[in-house]
Amino acid sequence: MERRRVVITGLGAITPVGLTAGESWQAVKNGVCGVAPITQFDPEGQKVTLAAEVKGFVPEDHMSRAEAKRMGRFTQMAVVAAREAMDQAGFTPAEEEKDRCGVIVSSGIGGLAITQAEHERGKARGWDRVSPFYIPTGICNMAAGQIAIATGFRGMCSCPVTACAGGTYAVGDAFHYIRDGYADVMLCGGTESAVTPLAIGGFTAMRALSESTDPNAASIPFDARRNGFVLGEGAGILLLEELDHALDRGANIIAEVVGYGATCDAYHMTAPRPDGSGGAKAMAIAIADAHITPDQVEYINTHGTSTCLNDSGETAAVKLVFGGHAKELAMSSTKSMTGHMLGAAGAVEAIFTALSLKDGFMPATINYKEPDPACDLDVVPNEGRSADLHYALSNSLGFGGHNGSVLLKKWEA
């Protein structure tokens, strides 16, 4: 089967540090921290009081009130990010093209806030008074479905629910779908909005979240002081396109997708394999998929959650794959700025990785103070760096043992 080349021609994002992909990337380049006290509910009585919320997003600025009411917040953000990606790509499909255009968008939790609200409504008013919009606005796949409705894309439409790796799986699956000839254009990525009492309470009970009250000492990947992640929210959508299709219409190409690997630890519900072997295999598969060698990779946008087990395990994984080259490459965590956006994380981080290649810039791991001997690689501490990058990986590791890695290449016409 012919291996077609796949490029990125459009980006859209809503994150804790910006309401567009461009705003978010500029904030990341500037080292802006999106962690702050929770505002979406009163966290009094909770051990965790910080989150990385999206600030200033008003859905009615982008759609009618009636449309907004028929979407959960996670879907609203995904649809707006998809429109941004389409606009940046300058792509309006002809009617006959729409069967060759598809959507793959992940969400790990979907409309959790909707579930909480409707549960309270059912208890108070009777279960037959639950909103008829509860199910279609709350289910995880509705972000993908609403994007397809908004764009008219009639090809493959899917929602990988692989926890924190979902956004990366969406990008990787879309890449393979185009590469192998099943589509010409795919909107792909992830979305999440789960800053709710139930989610905060659940993750806190697992001891997964940082209980720090200092926004600059909560999401601190690879730092010896780290003690949990900060829950974030947002959406990231990429428009992937077959190369000739993009060139024929004169599209502006941002980066090329060249490899994808996915594995499972098959080890534990939430903990990664301590030796990093599952994540290592995902990276190795992505590198082999691209027909390059490990020493050609110069930068990794890591999963880097700020949990003790993840960061040491991912460091071990990098050493397994790259050997001596691990000390030469750079790897940073933009979750130090955005928090952990769960199903949206991998998509937003793929966007940042594409822009790292385009702009020749490696973002920092901010608020880094105390080195950890178990995380002894170059984490680009505190200050981002300019670099002429050619290949970069974006990693995601999810509960359930899901590992995903996407390999991107600098676009050179």
Model-derived segments and their meaning:
Residues 1-67, 89, 244-256, 351-365, ...:
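ACP-dependent fatty acid/polyketide chain-elongation machinery
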Residues 5-9, 33-37, 214-290, 299, ...:
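Condensing-enzyme catalytic core mediating Claisen C-C bond formation in acyl metabolism
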Residues 8, 24, 29-162, 191-200, ...:
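Conserved beta-ketoacyl condensing-enzyme motif
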Residues 22-27, 113-127, 177-180, 200-213, ...:
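A glycine- and small-aliphatic-rich helix-loop capping segment at beta-alpha/alpha-beta transitions
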Residues 78-91, 140-143, 148-192, 230-251, ...:
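Active-site-proximal alpha-helical scaffold in enzymes
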Residues 85-97, 246-252, 283-299, 321-325:
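Phosphate/pyrophosphate-binding loops at sites that engage ATP/ADP/AMP, CoA/4′-phosphopantetheine
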Residues 124-131, 169-172, 176, 192-248, ...:
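Glycine-/small-residue-rich "gating" segment that lines the acyl/pantetheine channel
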Residues 182-227, 260-274, 304-311, 328-378:
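Acyl-CoA/ACP chain-elongation machinery
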